[in-house]
């Protein structure tokens, strides 16, 4: 496993991301594009935010991550879930460049949510995703188009929270901690290494063997993030 800045993120990730409207809008797209799909691989699942939402909706989910702090949160969620959900949810240690052996192929979808920006060899991850999808299976990838404008994202998020009456002491405390870590993440050239415009990612996926574009935009995180969904 890799113990890095994401171990520090583990405490605040759920507290903040689950409250960010920009994250919720992106997660809603993932739920939209996996509607009715039976088996979803959540590669680089982090704390299991997306995995848990998929499992609750009835999907069978295999999630994996290589950071001990994030993985511990996902494992705790899985263990505390009601038995029917727990039975459909597998959480593993693993690297997105070479999926764990226990990850079954023939999946209906592979989700790469805020994953590729941390990988120097994105082609390896995309090939692994392709190899684990059934014909017609979907790859969903979301992430930054460039080094993110943290100030813009947080200022607009805080304005939304205030307008909704959610900007309370607990959220302010979690935000302060999260922003400090995120600032380290976005300014360290070794932490964020790969960025995509949606059109560029679509072209790369076509080159690797994906065929049909179901979604491709750059609306998320107030224009900072791309979202792409393509069929094998």
Predicted regions, residues:
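A conserved beta-strand element that flanks and buttresses the S-adenosyl-L-methionine
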Residues: 111
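Class I SAM-dependent methyltransferase SAM/SAH-binding core
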Residues: 41, 47-98
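A short glycine-rich, Lys/Arg-flanked "PGG" loop and its adjoining helix->strand segment in the class I
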Residues: 123-135
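Short conserved loop adjoining the S-adenosyl-L-methionine
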Residues: 98-104
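Conserved class I S-adenosyl-L-methionine
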Residues: 1-35, 49, 53, 80, 140-170, ...
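Short alpha-helix
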Residues: 192-208
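Core SAM-dependent methyltransferase catalytic element
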Residues: 208-209, 217-232
């Amino acid at each position: 496993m890799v113990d890095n800045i994401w171990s520090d993120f583990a405490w605040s990730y759920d507290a903040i991301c689950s409250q960010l409207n920009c994250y919720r809008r992106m997660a809603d797209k993932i739920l939209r594009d996996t509607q009715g799909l039976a088996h979803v691989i959540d590669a680089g699942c982090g704390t299991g935010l997306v995995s848990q939402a998929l499992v609750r909706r009835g999907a069978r989910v295999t999630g994996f991550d290589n950071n001990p702090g994030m993985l511990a949160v996902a494992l705790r969620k899985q263990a505390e879930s009601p038995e029917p959900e727990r039975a459909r949810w597998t959480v593993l240690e693993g690297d997105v460049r070479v999926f764990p052996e226990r990850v079954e192929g023939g999946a209906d979808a592979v989700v790469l949510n805020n994953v590729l920006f941390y990988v120097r060899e994105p082609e390896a991850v995309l090939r692994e995703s392709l190899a684990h999808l059934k014909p017609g299976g979907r790859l969903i990838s979301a992430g930054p188009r460039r080094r993110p404008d943290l100030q813009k994202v947080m200022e607009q998020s805080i304005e939304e929270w205030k307008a909704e009456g959610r900007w309370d002491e607990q959220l302010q405390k979690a935000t302060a901690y999260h922003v400090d870590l995120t600032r380290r993440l976005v300014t360290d050239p070794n932490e964020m290494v790969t960025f995509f415009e949606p059109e560029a990612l679509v072209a790369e996926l076509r080159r690797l063997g994906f065929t049909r574009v179901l979604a491709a935009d750059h609306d998320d995180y107030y224009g900072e993030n791309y979202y792409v969904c393509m069929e094998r």
